Regions:
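N-terminal segments that cap or nucleate solenoid repeat domains
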Residues: 1-29
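Glycine-rich hexapeptide-repeat left-handed beta-helix
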Residues: 1-2, 14, 38-50, 56-126, ...
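Basic, Lys/Arg-rich alpha-helical nucleic-acid-recognition elements, primarily the DNA-binding modules
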Residues: 22, 35, 53
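Charged, well-structured alpha/beta interaction segments
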Residues: 29-31, 37
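Short, amphipathic C-terminal "tail helix"
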Residues: 238-260
Length: 260
């Protein structure tokens, strides 16, 4: 373990073997950091925060600060971060409120680029890429392998499905289903632009799976006006497979509505 002499690390914090803490970083009382995680200079980690192993946390990151929520009264809510994440400069990850599960969660192997904001009660899966200045409102859920380009702004309580791709400067007021591409023009609300076929191929999806999802997309977004009708047709016309079930369940469970 290496702690720079200018860093301020609480004697109550739990740092395991191989952790490095750079100049002028501050680690609070209730922080746990797993082995071989590197904390660069000028990082602040506070609150009830647990960080896993082999994370790379760059200068001026803030993790575990209070939620930007007027109802928060200092309760002991948490931030949980997995393993092997890269968290670049000026990223902010706020602790949760008491309105849900008391936890803001970031999974493993994610890449959060500069100035990304992860608000209170967000839940991020694994292997997500969030480009510079992408912003998540509170209670947002982001699925595995999703890509959010620069300056994407996501409304609170929105869900982003696994393997979705969102183009830059896009406002996201409604749920983005798994496996699709979405974009808006210069800050406009998102619209869907088909299946994320390149991403699916890169991640090893079979031709049969991609073709089945393409057929489902065509029925749901081009041939039917109501999702209830589209789901019925898809179930009647396409042999079920796990990715198709994931897509249909995501649509059926939506509370904010589905992007078209």
């Amino acid at each position: 373990m290496e702690i720079h002499h200018t860093a301020v690390v609480s004697p109550h914090a739990q740092l395991t073997s191989g952790v490095k803490v750079g100049p002028y970083s501050i680690i609070g009382d209730n922080v746990t950091i797993g082995r071989d995680t590197v904390i660069h200079s000028h990082v602040v980690i506070d609150g009830h925060t647990r960080i896993g192993e082999r994370n790379d946390i760059c200068p001026f990151v803030s993790i575990g600060s209070p939620p930007q929520d007027l109802g928060y009264k200092g309760e002991d809510t948490r931030v949980l971060i997995g393993d092997d994440n890269i968290i670049r400069e000026y990223v902010t990850i706020n602790r949760a409120t008491t309105k849900q599960d008391w936890e803001t969660i970031v999974g493993s192997e994610n890449y959060l680029m500069a100035y990304v904001h992860v608000a209170h009660d967000c839940v991020l899966g694994n292997k997500i890429i969030m480009s510079n200045v992408a912003t998540l409102g509170g209670h947002t859920i982001v699925g595995d392998y999703a890509i959010l380009s620069g300056l994407v702004a996501v409304h609170q309580f929105v869900r982003i499905g696994a393997h979705a791709f969102i183009g830059g400067k896009t406002a996201i007021p409604k749920d983005i289903p798994p496996f699709v591409m979405a974009a808006g023009a210069e800050g406009a609300r998102a619209k869907l632009f088909g299946l994320n076929q390149n991403g699916l191929r890169r991640h090893g999806f079979s031709r049969e799976t991609i073709n089945g999802l393409k057929k489902a997309y065509k029925i749901l977004w081009r041939e039917t006006g109501r999702f209830s009708e589209g789901i019925r047709r898809v179930r009647e016309e396409i042999e079920p497979f796990s990715e198709l079930d994931m897509l249909l369940d995501f649509i059926s469970e939506s509370k904010r509505g589905i992007t078209r």
